[in-house]
Structures are given as C-alpha cells and as structure tokens.
C-alpha cells in the first residue's frame, strides 16, 4: 500500500466502531496507529487484561517544586469506542499497535490563535439541516444502520468539509505534527500496510502532513520535562463521565444507549430503552403507564419515517417519550436539544430520561493491573503526617502538626474513602477551638476505593481537588457550592481550574432564592478575608465565587418579593451579610469585581421603591445608614415609616433595626419622631402593627433595650423614674404563665399534626 488508510472517526461512536473493526479485519494491516497518549505504548498489553469497561488511560505530570499545578487527562475506552475495537481487532490479526498522540503534559498550553473553524462549519450545517445540535446531526448522518455501506466515503467527505482549508490552532498543529511523524515512520518501514484511527477533524490534515516528514525518520519520542514527574496508568471510569452532556466534549450523548446500539443494534436498543425508562419512572413514582409506552413506540416510528430514518434513532425515541408522557407546557427546552448545564426548570420526567441513559456503571480493572500512584501517594501522606490506621485520632487544627493531619484526612473524606470518619469537629475552618476527633479503620473496600479514586488524579491533593471541582459543577445551588468551598478550606485546597471558575459564575447566576445568599456570603467572605491558616485568604476561587455571589445577591434583592414566615430570618440574614461586606468595602477593603457605587445606587432605588416589600425598603435604608450615606438619616427613616400603612410600618422598622439599630435606636430625634408616629395611629391600627413592632424591637440586646428605655423616659420628661416603670406588671403568678405556654404549645402541635399550621 503506497498510502496509509486514515480513518477519521468520532470518539465513542458505535457506527465508527463497527467501521474500524470491519476495516482492520478485512485489510489486515501490519501497523494500526491510534489517536491516544503515546506515553502508554510500552504498557499497551495492560489494556488486554480482563477489565470491566469503561476504563481509561490517565496521563499526568506533577511538578516536584509545587510551583506550578500538575496536569492530567483521561483517555477513556468503552466497548463501543472505535479506538477500543481497533485495539481488539489489531490484537486478533497480530498487527503492531501504537498510540500516536501527545499526552496532555507534552502539549502546549498556548491559547488558540485562530477562530474555531469546526464550530463555524458545524453552525452552517445545523442551519442548513434545521438540527438542534451537532449530536442530533451526527446521529442523522451516520448512526442509521442503513448507512453502513456508504459510511467510509460519507465520513471522509463530512470531515473534509468540516476542516476545509483551516490549519487549526497552535495546539492542534502541534499534535498533528507528532501524529504525522508516526505515520511517516510506519510508512518508511515499508513492510506492510498502515491503518490510522484518529479523530475526524485531524484526518484531512494528517493525509497531507505525513508526506512532509523527512526521508529518514526515527520512531517519534516524547519530550522530557525538567523538574516534573510524568506517568500514566489505567484507571476505572464511569459511564456518566462518557456523556457529552456531562461536559466530556469528545463524548457521545447517552452512553447507555450507545452501548445498546453496539451490542444489539437499533431495533433492540429501542425496545430496551422503553423497558428501562418505564421501570425507572415507576421507581421514581413518576407517571408512566404501559399505554404511554405504546404511544411512545408509535410516536417514535412516525418520527423516524418523517425524518427519513430506517429505524428510530436516539432523538426519535427521546422526543417520542417526551411527547407521550408530558401533558403540560415545558418551562425549559428538552435537555438533549442543547449542551451545557441542564436548565433548573427541566421536567422531572426528562431528568429521569437523561440520568437513565447517562448510566451509573463503573469500570473495574483486572486484578493483575499495575497499581496507579494514588494509593502510594496516600501511604506517603499518612506516613508524613504520622497517621496510622486503624486508630482513633484527636487533633487540633491550630497546631502545625494537627493542621497537616487534618488536611490529609479531609482530602480522603472528600474522595469518600471508606474507613475515614470524622466524629467531632466544626464544618468551618475558622469556627470552634480547632479540635477534631476521627475514627480511622482499614476496611477491605478502602484499597479498591483508592484505585477507583485515581480517576480524579495521581496524588491525594490533585484527586481531592478534581473531586471537589466535579462536586461543585454538580451542585444544586449556592448552598452546595459554599459547602464544597468550606471542605476545600478544611482540606487546604486553594487553587482550582479556570474552567471551574467560569462554570461557577454561571451556576451561581442560576440561584433564585435571596434567603439562601446570607449564609453563603458570610462563609465565603470570612474565608476570603481571614482564612490564612488554610491558605484560602485571597484565593482566586473564593474571589471569583464571592464576586459572583455578591452580584447575584444584589440582583435578587431588587427583584424578590415578600418572604414567607419560614424564610423571614434567613431573608434578613442575607441583607445583614451583604451590608457587612459593603461596609468593609466602604472602609477600604479592596474586592476587585464589585462596584460599591453600583451597590449603593441599587440600595437607594430599593429603599425608595413604592412597590417593594416594606421589609426590604427598611433593610435597604438601614444598609445605607451603615454606609454613612448622606441621604440616609433618622429623618429619612421617619419619612419612610410615615409613607407606609400601619401594617407595613412594623415590617419596615424590622428591616431598619436589623441593619442599623446602632444608628437609630438611641437617637433622640428618631425616638421622638417614632413616638409621634405611633400616637397618630388609631387603636385598631396600633394593635395590628404591634406584633411586627415588638418583633422589630427583639433585635435590640438587653443593654440596648435599657438605653432605649432611658431615651423614652427622657423624651417624656420622666427621667427620674426607673426603667422598670416601662414594664407592664403581671397580675398572675409565673406558674400560671408557664401552664398557659404549655397549653399553647400543645394547641400548635395539634394544628401542625392536622396540617393547619406549619412551623
């Protein structure tokens, strides 16, 4: 063969897997070159052990001085991956097999220096075909079994049009030059045919570039990195992480569906889909009947005919099931019609569909597989910090030795390693006396868990950080993200990837509960400002998250409605936490990304908004008073209260005192004006406003209540009387009061039991 057979594929495509398998078995090449990390070539035989798929090659580098973060990447294999079928077919015909791509640590970190031609070309195709996304387009063009005969030419034409004349960015040019050298070397051996399996985007370029290699070329070698340890190993992988919807850009949607298609073909895969979805929906107590499934089957067949498919494809089935089971209007687009974070308003039935087809399987390595470095690194870390298993360990985080031990144990806890249980200790790094108590055991499942956790990284620190990144991307709100960052502080993890920083900003922007923001602001700000012990002070991850949280809080405080009773105190807590941060910014604290002037302008608008809840108007004005705004004074507070109805004035006072009690409660002018305001109320209005007025005064601690009492007596020129003169004397014994309180609690419990009253 004077030309190599270069087969451009889409990773994890069953159709491409069948094609590659067929070509290798029919052509019987001497060399099979596969796009994959070349640092694994010396250990490729490990892939043929009795593994349970999916598994992955993990290539990594760790800089010994710790000055730069390590790098690592996974190359996963499933049964339906073209690369896996190429390996198996090559082994059967005894071909020489090599991975020919640069591992991640040998790739340039330069930014792309050219526009993404692939995205532009695909966008044109999508507009021309009216497809939702590139995954639907791919299924339509190539995954229909009737197209298998014409598949080689169709793929070649598709990828040639997709690539066009584009040279690619710097990273792609670097990788393609390395792969071309491998092809040139194999061709120069002149002792057999050469077949190349690579991503379709690279195929047109490689067909040209291998000819430009020197006349004589040695087998390509990888560069060496100074002051860095590099390596690769096999690790278990999960079905979910193969899903393109989970963020794996080289993946295919619905790995479970792809596996069914590979094993049984489209027809049986569709039947299995209906059975599995029906079972899963019933397990989740979601509406699904046999009649619904019959309707979905009929609907899918009709959609397939309408769209020109011999048998229903993935989106035909999903669209049909959605149309048959969902009876009401959708508040979010179908999750398979787009990529990225799933919309929070997605229907539960659709979420179940996506979760079922993403799978929950996890690969398992053969017993004789060489051990990855994570278990070894964990052993070294335990020895370094003098932790022995099993044991019951008590430590103090405020001592150097205790801090080192605590961080190692918290990293293991983040990875959910069995046998590592904290029995006592604060969930916040700055709280408590620093004492922690751990129960450490060594169950049989511990070593297996460390092997599985290797998919997150080669060292304990890297693995814990990657696991936290994954947890934060899966977080269901600002509260979950804050919990993860608190765990990061306890584990001493302060640096995270740029991709995570960008995603966190998007995730936080989806939070829609103002009451949830207070605790998050309090914790994030404390960690960013004060947590020097754990290395979180001023950390980029905290600064990015804190700025996004402040921005979202400001947006929510201007758009939220009146809180219900359950959220009342949390709502005020959010106002207090926001005000505390703005006050520090006003005092000179520098937080890049937060505009104090914009925040003050928003508070002014909120305090003057006629239709805003009285509680928010009072809180906004109280915040302005804390910030020493020239237009925020006792007179402004009295003017606001006078504008409100008697029922609203108590709520407004609640907000004012919650944020500015020092500025108001002891001011004679405010006390005189507020007393005059109360005197103008009718008896009925006063009685209606009294509960909120009394609750507002609860913000004053005992000493400040005493000071307020003196001010009230002086206002009425009764300063000679004791403060107790303002207290209403009780005409019944304390035992009677206690008895009636008990009766009240019993009555409330009965009402709650019958669903009439909710705490």
Swiss-Prot record:
Pfam family, one: DUF5682
Gene Ontology terms: cellular component: cytosol
InterPro entries listed in its UniProt record: DUF5682, LolB
Name by which UniProt lists this protein: Uncharacterized protein YehM
Gene this protein is translated from: yehM
